[in-house]
């Protein structure tokens, strides 16, 4: 699994002109599922997102997690984070899990994340989404297992 994680002031997902999810301060995670990902990867990524210290203390040091600051997490499935651009001009997505497998793993990941005592919202799997992100910092990290 791979997640592009951004600290945000707010985030919103719109599908077909309808807002389906919206958060205030917290994290937006664009999550890709790789072939072979399962329970272990879901648990690792959920724990990492909730406890990742990328929120600043009073001295400007990254000492707080989204859980510590009472923030929310908006999770968006996104197979393109597994785009391999090393050859040619068109990304290859052969590492990404096929949709029927990825959907099951993504839903399990959301279930585990929702057990973590933090507000979790998500986009719609395999939908064409408009994702509005107001990045805070900007702070953007990649988490991979």
From Swiss-Prot:
Record remark: domains: A Gly-cisPro motif from one monomer fits into the active site of the other monomer to allow specific chiral rejection of L-amino acids.
UniProtKB keywords: Cytoplasm, Hydrolase, RNA-binding, tRNA-binding
Biological process, per Gene Ontology: D-amino acid catabolic process
Gene Ontology terms for molecular function: D-tyrosyl-tRNA(Tyr) deacylase activity; Gly-tRNA(Ala) deacylase activity; Ser(Gly)-tRNA(Ala) hydrolase activity; tRNA binding
Subunit structure: Homodimer.
Enzymatic reactions: glycyl-tRNA(Ala) + H2O = tRNA(Ala) + glycine + H(+); a D-aminoacyl-tRNA + H2O = a tRNA + a D-alpha-amino acid + H(+)
Any single Pfam family the record assigns to this protein: Tyr_Deacylase
Listed name of the protein: D-aminoacyl-tRNA deacylase
